[in-house]
Amino acid sequence: MENQKNFLTTAPYKGTRDFYPEEMRLRNWMFSIMRETVLSFGYEEYDGPILESFDLYKAKSGEEIVERQLYDFIDKGERRVAIRPEMTPTLARMVAGNLRNLPRPVRWFSIPNLWRYEQPGKGRLREHWQLNVDLFGVDTHRAELEILLMADSILKKFGAPTGSYQIKVSHRKLLDSFLKNSLKLSDHQVHGVSKLLDKKSKISPETFEAEIKPLLNNFNEQFSLIETYLASNLETVSTIPGIDPDSIHFIRNLFQELGELGIDKQLVFDPSIIRGFDYYTGCIFEVFDTNPENRRSLYGGGRYDNLIGLFSKEQLSGIGFGLGDVTLKSFLENHNLIPDLSREKTLFLPIMDESIFVDTFKLSKELRENGILTETMLDSAKIGKQIQVAEKKGYRYVLFLGESEIRTETVQIKDLVSGEQKSLPRKGLSDILKKDFRL
């Protein structure tokens, strides 16, 4: 019996993806729209190392990330390092390290890949890419105004129609005042109830009630007040005793100005928005997909006033958000917003005969120098097989250069979709292709 060789699996690591050319075209298109939108607001792109000291995340990231989701190990120099699960700690380190030289306000963005060890599921993988946008050095609500305007502009740039998403807004000080003043909870109780409220949408009402009961002093009265708070709007929330009036005033002013900028139809006040108890200190928001098939949070962010506290005595306020590629792709698919990304705007050039190989390459070189993306075959297989290659790769146009075309200083172009074929002059060919064929 012959020895059987155990081949390695071709599957990617659990929770990660291979990006074949067609998936890469989609990813590049998504990133280009995001990048183009953020750049239009005057933001600058940055990046940092994928490896950081474990201590950075221990000090800056949430408990769940550090204890259960972090990929960390001891390197060959006996240093404990971690693969970045989020970009904010790196951002804080970089800003603090160059704080004196940064003109304010600081407007930065990045699209890094991030790693978290968690159970892969719908909209959640172990490796994903995320647009991170941050604005520092502005203490007024103008920062929230710009960030929310950008969060809205990104989806509009993808063609998202009005009503396909909502921007839910709340304020951390509103929640804090409710828990401490209205419910009169201790700091320990506040921490536990906040964490439970943060995961409320992911558990059943029965589980939520059972888990919150031990955290309350007077269950019936306090639980009823919690239900009232979570169901409140901007008018009714102000009637709850102990609620911070400044937070309500802040959100009202913000909504009024955003309405004047044309995005009031997407805005919703939602006091159930938590966005991580240990992180945000002011206004918080989440963008939700309204499609019944994908009714979930797409991305979100908020205000943080202690960004660089681990590195510097200087205080620097900031606000930002993160938009992951997995949830964005799901949103675009559910709302049919992904265009045809086949290679229609590129040209395929077969080799008609070995004797004119150099002439064919000269033509393709000329086309590329004039800004037309051109793929050239590298051997003179039967023309039918070469066209099959072009069709399989998604090309629409094939350009033929044979001996007769060389003599007459022409080329033949064929539309693989319609089957139409016509002769074009060599002189001014690039301009003709750009104008008439939009290549």
From Swiss-Prot:
One of its GO terms (cellular component) is cytoplasm. It catalyses: tRNA(His) + L-histidine + ATP = L-histidyl-tRNA(His) + AMP + diphosphate + H(+). Signal peptide: none annotated. PROSITE patterns: AA_TRNA_LIGASE_II (PS50862). The keyword Protease does not apply. Keywords: Aminoacyl-tRNA synthetase, ATP-binding, Cytoplasm, Ligase, Nucleotide-binding, Protein biosynthesis. It is an enzyme of class 6 (ligase). One of its GO terms (biological process) is histidyl-tRNA aminoacylation. It comes from the Bacteria. The keyword RNA-binding does not apply. Its EC number is 6.1.1.21. One of its GO terms (molecular function) is histidine-tRNA ligase activity. It is found in: Cytoplasm. It holds the Pfam family HGTP_anticodon. Homodimer. Belongs to the class-II aminoacyl-tRNA synthetase family. This is Histidine--tRNA ligase. It comes from Leptospira borgpetersenii serovar Hardjo-bovis (strain JB197). The gene is hisS.
